[in-house]
Amino acid sequence: MFQYTLYGDGIHDDTAAIQERIDSGACEVALPVPEKHYLISKPLTIPSNFKLKLPRYAVIRLADGANCLMLQNKTVLRDEPDPNVFYYGRFSASRAHTCHDFEIEGGIWDFNNQNQEANPIQTGHFDDRYYLGHVMCFYNVRNFRLSNLTIKDPANFCVTVDTGSYFTVENITFDFNFGNPIAVNMDGIHLNGNCHYGVIRNLQGACYDDLVALNAHEGTRGDITNIQIDGVFAENCHSAVRLLTVEEKVEHIHISNVYGTYYQYCIGFTKYYPGETTGYFGAISLDNIHAAKSFRLPIQEAHMQNKTRHFPLIWMQDGTVVKNLSIEHFHRREYVNPIDTIRVDKGACVEQLWILDLSLENHTQSHCPKLTNHGTIQTLRTEGLPAEEIENTGVIVNLRCT
């Protein structure tokens, strides 16, 4: 029936055989349990109205020296590429060319990063081969689901979504063991600009950068709105969630049920890139956060020029604008690092901040602040956090503590 043999022996290349089955016209392909593991040397390309299913713990591995994505959606090339947008600028963003209604389920997706080229963010090697170091990349997509799988040892990000709407990413395990060349810039689920109406839930395992990133000023750049993140579980992870904007809106975001220890920050409102801040974070809700700091291991700080700099668990970076933020049911039991629990940096502006039910058990030998403000807070409302426990060197215009 098929021209290409599906081996699954870990020796022969299975790329053509798997892609042939994907392209067969069937609406679903379920790969059998492999003899050893599947081996691919080129990206698998997923069309609309299609589901690819692997046995939950079947390994699919990127061949040595493949230097490519493992999986991508079907795209249409633009007549005139956008020279200002690397990789994504080649593809059409037209609704007529959207890849839609597809699903990937199961498998252990092993990028085999020690046997690929190094992370291009570290090497600066961005050329016309478009090697990203990502495991999976989705562009101009709608109504898709990624579920019940493990992603192992990427060179860069595990999953990147750019210009995507109405999606679910759930029940994902991260298995990170090495960096190439170093353990940094290795995100879990990474959203670039123009992503809306998504659910990201039940993510487990530590990453060597942001476990979830909502980075509006990256890729095609654009607003990120209406995203629910529910259930992040990680021990000794870089960070749980980063939100990032310079010129864009990041709003209507709900982050809940975050557990674990984090060596950089737990949730960060960041700018990172230079330029005038014209964008903002708005209508952000954080609740049921159980987090503390962890020690940084040598592999995790090898790239750091300043190893003495530490970040709070909830961080509003210099240059950011937060219109409204609520933090409810935040519980910290700290044994490692008494850095601030919540901090607004100098040069950051928060228009409305609500804090309800913030608890701290400090088992270190040093003072551990609950809330530190070096910036500007227009309106601050707290319940259970008295004014005398707020460390303020900035400006708080309206303060109400009950």
Residue ranges and their predicted role:
Residues 1-402:
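Extracellular/periplasmic carbohydrate-active domains that bind, remodel
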